[in-house]
Amino acid sequence: MAKIILRHLIETPVRYQEEFEARGLEDCRLDHTLYALPGPTIEDLSKARGAGTPQALAEDSASTEKPPGEGKSRFQILLDVVQFLPEDIIIQTFEGWLLIKAQHGTRMDEHGFISRSFTRQYKLPDGVETKDLSAILCHDGILVVEVKDSLGTK
């Protein structure tokens, strides 16, 4: 099997290897559901993948309207932090805001010395607390912060 090399920094072939194997590279090149940033939720991604099939179109036309609150997507943030080590990343909540900070010291690269840092702030949905959040750093350098699945299931 030939390896696929993508030159765009946002594309993540590791996360969607099955998708690349099932479809040709040219089909995937402009498929924005495969981009890591900004990322769709898992539910949105599965809908987008099957949206063009006749079966999906028939299901959409036959579907009934959902009660309020059921169709809402959950809170999820995807950040490309491939340049940072896990110990360089700080995740905090403060007064209804999620703060994500990362900074690494001066390092040598092919052009000389470089240091990087960023700070992102996101308004948390009403009722979401620190204990309701989970954070995962994927092997391809994508930080995923989302509301735990147990929230809202009764």
UniProtKB/Swiss-Prot annotation:
Keyword Membrane carried by entry: no
CDD domains reported in the protein's UniProt record: ACD_HspB3_Like (cd06477)
Keywords in alphabetical order: Cytoplasm, Nucleus, Stress response
Domain of life: Eukaryota
Region described as Disordered: 48-71
Subcellular location field: Cytoplasm; Nucleus
GO terms for cellular component: cytoplasm; nuclear speck; nucleus
Annotated sHSP domain residues: 57-154
tRNA processing is among the record's keywords: no
Protein purpose: Inhibitor of actin polymerization.
Protein family (similarity comment): Belongs to the small heat shock protein (HSP20) family.
Protein name per UniProt: Heat shock protein beta-3
